[in-house]
Structures are given as C-alpha cells and as structure tokens.
Amino acid sequence: MPAIQPPLYPTFLLLILLSLIITLYAWIISTITYKTAMRHAALYQRSFFRWSFDHSL
C-alpha cells in the first residue's frame, strides 16, 4: 500500500458535507429572493394597475 495516498473516507465525507452546505445556502438564498421578488412584483402590479386606471379615466 502506498503511504502517499490520502485517506479517501474523510475527504469523501468533507466533500459531501460541503455540497450539502452549498445546496442549503443556495436554497435559502433562492427562497428569500423569490419571496422578496414576489412581494415587489405584487407592489409594482398594484401601483401599475392604479396608475393605468387613473390614466384611463
């Protein structure tokens, strides 16, 4: 057995942990962005509807 070879199991475990953390981070960010985007979209839609209604009269 070569002594230079790094232990595979801890590296594999670290890789899995890292990917899990990255996935969780991305999911949280996308959820927050989606919620704020939906809120802003509702706000803009409401104001735009009011503006078009005022200008149509």
UniProtKB/Swiss-Prot annotation:
This is Small hydrophobic protein. Keywords: Host cell membrane, Host membrane, Host-virus interaction, Inhibition of host NF-kappa-B by virus, Membrane, Transmembrane, Transmembrane helix, Virion. It is a single-pass membrane protein. Residues 30-57 are intravirion. It holds the Pfam family SH. The keyword RNA-binding does not apply. Interacts with host TNFRSF1A, RIPK1 and IRAK1; these interactions interfere with host NF-kappa-B activation at the level of receptor complexes. Interacts with host protein UBQLN4. GO terms for cellular component: host cell plasma membrane; membrane; virion membrane. It comes from Mumps virus (strain Takahashi) (MuV). The chain crosses the membrane at residues 9-29. Residues 1-8 are virion surface. Its main location: virion. Belongs to the rubulavirus small hydrophobic protein family. The gene is SH. Plays a role in the inhibition of the host NF-kappa-B pathway. This inhibition occurs at the receptor level, by preventing the signaling of TNFR1 as well as IL-1R and TLR3. One of its GO terms (biological process) is symbiont-mediated suppression of host NF-kappaB cascade.
